[in-house]
Amino acid sequence: MSFRGGGGGRGGGFNRGGGGGRGGGFGGGRGGGFGGGRGGGFGGGRGGRGGFNRNQDYGPPEYVVALGEFMHPCEDEIVCKCVTEENKVPYFNAPVYLENKEQIGKVDEIFGQLRDFYFSVKLSDNMKASSFKKLQKFYIDPMKLLPLQRFLPRPPGEKGPPRGGRGGGGGRGGRGGGFRGGRGANGGGRGGFGGRGGGFGGRGGGGGGFRGGRGGGGGRGFRGGR
C-alpha cells in the first residue's frame, strides 16, 4: 500500500499539470507537486509541469530549518535521511541549502516508510556528490514543507474536502501507508531496500514492507498500485 502518485487531470493549479485526477494529493509529473492517482498521499516521482510556478527562483529565504542529513552519493545525486521537525514532508523540487543558505540542489525523490523516510537531491551544476561528509546537515525554506498528516489515511467516517471539477481537489484520498520507492536508502548506486515489496522502495533488492520501484527480490509485501 504505497502512496503512489499518478498523473493529474488537466485542471488544478496553473498551466496544465498541477493538481487533480481522482486522488487525494497534489498533481504529479516532472516538475511539480504531489501525486494524484486513486490513492491518497503522493508519489515519489518528479513532479508535473504546472503547480503554481513553483520552479521559479526567488533567491534564498529569510531563514532555513533542518531538512536532512547526508547518507551517501548516488550517481550524480545524493541520498539524505529526513530529519524535519514532526516528520514534515518537503515539496518536490524544493531548493535545498547549506546552513549559510547556499543552494546545493533540489529535492528529487522521496522514499521510505511514513515516519522514517529519505529523499534524494538533484545537485546544482557546480556541486559534486563526493564533496559532502557523512551526516552533514542540509536545510530548507520552512514554507516548502507540508505536515505528514496530509498523507495519512483519513479516520473512518471523516469526510474529505469538496470534490472539484476536472482536476479539482479531494476525491477519493488515502489508501496506503508508505512513500513510493526512489533510489534506495542505504548502499550505493540505485540499490537500497526495495523491489516490489521493498522496505524503502528503491530499484534494488530487499523485501517486505511497502512497494518500491522496479527492484529485485523480496516477497510481495504490501503491494501498492491501485
Swiss-Prot record:
Keywords: Nucleus, Repeat, Ribonucleoprotein, Ribosome biogenesis, RNA-binding, rRNA processing
Subcellular localization(s) per the UniProt record: Nucleus, Nucleolus
Biased amino acid composition, Gly residues: 162-226
Example of a GO MF term: box H/ACA snoRNA binding
Top-level taxonomic group: Eukaryota
Disordered: annotated span: 1-30, 150-226
Annotated SUPFAM superfamilies: Translation proteins (SSF50447)
Region described as RGG-box 2: spans on this chain: 163-226
GO cellular component: box H/ACA snoRNP complex; telomerase holoenzyme complex
GO terms, biological process: definitive hemopoiesis; rRNA processing; snoRNA guided rRNA pseudouridine synthesis; telomere maintenance via telomerase
Residue ranges, annotated region (RGG-box 1): 4-51
Disulfide pairings: none
Function per UniProt: Required for ribosome biogenesis. Part of a complex which catalyzes pseudouridylation of rRNA. This involves the isomerization of uridine such that the ribose is subsequently attached to C5, instead of the normal N1. Pseudouridine ('psi') residues may serve to stabilize the conformation of rRNAs.
Assembly and oligomerization: Component of the small nucleolar ribonucleoprotein particle containing H/ACA-type snoRNAs (H/ACA snoRNPs). Component of the telomerase holoenzyme complex.
Protein family membership: Belongs to the GAR1 family.
Protein name from the UniProt record: H/ACA ribonucleoprotein complex subunit 1
Organism name: Danio rerio (Zebrafish)
